[in-house]
Amino acid sequence: MAIANKNIIFVAGLGGIGLDTSREIVKSGPKNLVILDRIDNPTAIAELKAINPKVTVTFYPYDVTVPVAETTKLLKTIFAQLKTVDLLINGAGILDDHQIERTIAVNFTGTVNTTTAIMEFWDKRKGGPGGVIANICSVTGFNAIYQVPVYSASKAAALSFTNSLARLAPITGVTAYSINPGITRTPLVHKFNSWLDVEPRVGELLLEHPTQTTLECAQNFVKAIEANKNGAIWQLDLGQLIAVEWTKHWDSHI
């Protein structure tokens, strides 16, 4: 999907990977970039507008843990303004295994709820035009960082949800793919809490191994958007974009 002249909603587009990805997106010339984020960062919004003045960049405060009805209300406002939305990026995430309920609420339930809300406007069974969803998951959805099992499980759940969305595309008209970054140098990974403090130095230990920058991740994210492959499981690691072939161990046969 060419980004030029498209309308894009980016949930958590001001975070570490999110902000660099927003920068790369506006360089590609969408018509509108609507950022929904819990963090209000007027400086970042002004920077994005300055990168490409032809792009309309809009910010709305948004917490992914709110009920679906509240998200639907916000999306109604956005759709009334833009008329159409081409791409939804779900990027909210936290890494803190002390906060069990919030980790699941942000990393998994928030993605499900935001997706559910936009179906009101996109689902072809309701006369909608369809759309594209890019969910930021994690390589920990493939193999856990076992010292943060809650985080890893929440990302595995988001990945499974995304894979199902892709399979449902013939019914809903909405396609989906997952973005799975490897260890990326962001404030998120410099210091965080392991589950039951099983490894106090888990962040430091991860950074002893090869990592990637947020810019490298963002540039590959844009490539994945442009590829626009329904059901793709993209691994963004060490500056590379890799299409992961998922191994099927069981099938429901329905």
Swiss-Prot record:
Matching Pfam families: adh_short
Keyword NAD: yes
InterPro entries: ADH_Drosophila-type (IPR002425), NAD(P)-bd_dom_sf (IPR036291), Sc_DH/Rdtase_CS (IPR020904), SDR_fam (IPR002347)
Mitochondrion recorded as keyword: no
Active site: residue positions: Y151
The protein, known as: Alcohol dehydrogenase 2
Keywords, ordered alphabetically: NAD, Oxidoreductase
Binding-site residues for NAD(+), renumbered to this chain: 10-33
GO cellular component entries: cytoplasm
Family matches, as Gene3D superfamilies: NAD(P)-binding Rossmann-like Domain
Quaternary data: Homodimer.
Any one GO BP annotation for this protein: alcohol metabolic process
GO molecular function: alcohol dehydrogenase (NAD+) activity
Family: Belongs to the short-chain dehydrogenases/reductases (SDR) family.
Protein EC: 1.1.1.1
Binding of substrate, residues: S138
Reactions accelerated catalytically: a primary alcohol + NAD(+) = an aldehyde + NADH + H(+); a secondary alcohol + NAD(+) = a ketone + NADH + H(+)
SUPFAM superfamilies hit by this protein: NAD(P)-binding Rossmann-fold domains
